[in-house]
Swiss-Prot record:
Subunit field text: Heterodimer with PP1.
Acidic residues biased stretches: 121-130, 167-179
Gene behind the chain: PPP1R2
InterPro entries: PPI-2 (IPR007062)
Modified positions (Phosphothreonine) in chain numbering: 73, 89, 92
Comp. bias regions, Polar residues: 17-26, 182-205
Protein name per its UniProtKB record: Protein phosphatase inhibitor 2
């Protein structure tokens, strides 16, 4: 009989039957409205944003960033604040040669603005440095000028290469002329007497 009762019972699954869900819906409809609000408030979450900010983003956290103390690279602005500076529209238009000549003559004695600004800023920066730091900064700026003066280095290299090539050409010409003279003296020596050969040797030396 135990076998027959087991076969009559339905196998229960993990999922709820439709009959159980409909009965729960009827029961929930009978509940007052206040209980539904309590259930919704239990399901929703409230975030304490200030606590999250204080925990994960504290004010003293540096995020792995560090301050690098190195001399600033000079920036030279090409556009000036005065009216003489060319704007984009002026640059595209053709300028009359006489106007250009007058502007060049007027600007001939003036120093570029970026150099004036550089001198002013360097004076302000050097005032708060110790003598050792000033010397270190001066050496750094000198090395930077030497390093970034590549155009001069290329010109010097070209001059050295051309000088070496010119010297090599002269050496080759001298060897060729010396070989030619020795061949000429040998040919003349073959057709002359021993006394003539001695005279030729005395003349050449």
């Amino acid at each position: 009989m135990a076998a027959s009762t087991a076969s009559h019972r339905p196998i229960k699954g993990i999922l709820k039957n439709k009959t159980s869900t409909t009965s729960s819906m009827v029961a929930s409809a009978e509940q007052p409205r206040g209980n539904v609000d309590e259930e919704l408030s239990k399901k929703s979450q409230k975030w304490d944003e200030m606590n999250i900010l204080a925990t994960y983003h504290p004010a003293d956290k540096d995020y792995g960033l560090m301050k690098i103390d190195e001399p600033s690279t000079p920036y030279h602005s090409m556009m000036g604040d005065d009216e003489d500076a060319c704007s984009d529209t002026e640059a595209t238009e053709a300028m009359a040669p006489d106007i250009l000549a007058r502007k060049l003559a007027a600007a001939e004695g003036l120093e570029p603005k970026y150099r004036i600004q550089e001198q002013e800023s360097s004076g302000e920066e050097d005032s708060d440095l110790s003598p050792e730091e000033r010397e270190k900064k001066r050496q750094f700026e000198m090395k930077r000028k030497l390093h970034y003066n590549e155009g001069l280095n290329i010109k010097l290299a070209r001059q050295l290469i051309s000088k070496d090539l010119h010297d090599d050409d002269e050496d080759e010409e001298m060897l060729e002329t010396a070989d030619g003279e020795s061949m000429n003296t040998e040919e003349s020596n073959q057709g002359s007497t021993p006394s003539d050969q001695q005279q030729n040797k005395l003349r050449s030396s």
